[in-house]
Amino acid sequence: MRFVKVFEEAIDPGAVAELLESFLTRFELVQLVSPAWEELAYYEKNTRDFLFPEPRLASSHLGMQREVLMKTAIWFPGIAPKIEFSTRTAILECVFPCKNRFICEERCRLERSVSKSHGQRVQATNRKKKPKEKDSDQLPKGTQSRLPSPQRLHLHRPTQRNHGKSFKFPGERKPPFVVRHVDSGNPFGENNLEHCSKKSRRKPKLINFDLSKKRASSLDSLEANIKVIREPDERIVLKSQPPPPVDSSESRKPSLSHQGDASLHTETSVTTSQLSRPPSPLNQPLLQERFQPFSQSTWQKIPEGVRSLLTSHRAHPKDSFISETNSIHERPSYPLKKHLLRAQRYF
């Protein structure tokens, strides 16, 4: 027979021996026939002395072969029965087992939940630390989204050389239409030659003459030369003609000054003006004669010119163009100094 006993509170073999003294070991001799289950003899002793008996001088094999006499009952006839047996005891260290299976499962679940929550907290702290380390090495988001690709950067390199600090990323907004007014005393051809030399690698984009004329005429009169700029690289020059003279003595001085400006202007902007607009009807020989100082020859030629204009297919466009220029001349002119100051900001 084998008996196993677990002591939960014991730490060493000495504590186990002390605990064995509190337990009792008992052998009983019971009668099976009638009267049944009557006790005939018994043997009892504490478990420590039963398992670990004191040594005896007579016994040759200590613990291997043992003999004990049982105590008989009062009514039992005869001698006391004797028991021969051998015992072997071993004290082993073991892990404390759970009494209830459900309690063990609950403890395991609690341990797993605690370990998972601790792991999630560690991962969250690591994630919070990583973006801070990355942000110190990387650029802000706004600049990353605005950084151009290598092809765009290569295309914008000539503008960076020409304009210097005025280079902007393609994501930024460009300034609106810019109108610059130039004084008639300042030669306009010099600035135009410099810009043409810088922008010779790029072809200027052409726009319609009528649209550019309406935008320019709404800001200033046609007495000054007007320059409309779509972009820093796209510039188209519009040339204005002097208004029809009212007096022969007053119209000679401005006509000479405007002719001088026009001669310089045509030399520098031949490439853009010839491609961007059709020939002006004011350059027609008949209209030039009408705007010249009055004389007897002109008075004689006026009826013939009127007849030719009425019979030609261009009569209506010329009349509309002359009425439009007259309405523009009647508008008040703005001072040129303010526009010059605004123009210097973009150049």
Swiss-Prot record:
Composition skew (Basic and acidic residues), residue ranges: 170-183
Residues bearing PTM Phosphoserine? S218, S221
Q: Which domain of life is it from?
A: Eukaryota
Region annotation (Disordered) maps to 115-199, 234-285
Q: Where is the composition biased (Polar residues)?
A: 116-125, 254-277
A Gene Ontology annotation in the biological process aspect, one of them, is: spermatogenesis
Molecular function (GO) terms for this protein are: myosin light chain binding
Segments of skewed composition (Basic residues):
153-166
Q: Which GO terms describe its cellular component?
A: sperm head-tail coupling apparatus
Q: What keywords tag this UniProt record?
A: Phosphoprotein
Protein family according to the UniProt entry: Belongs to the SPATA6 family.
Protein name per Swiss-Prot or TrEMBL: Spermatogenesis associated 6-like protein
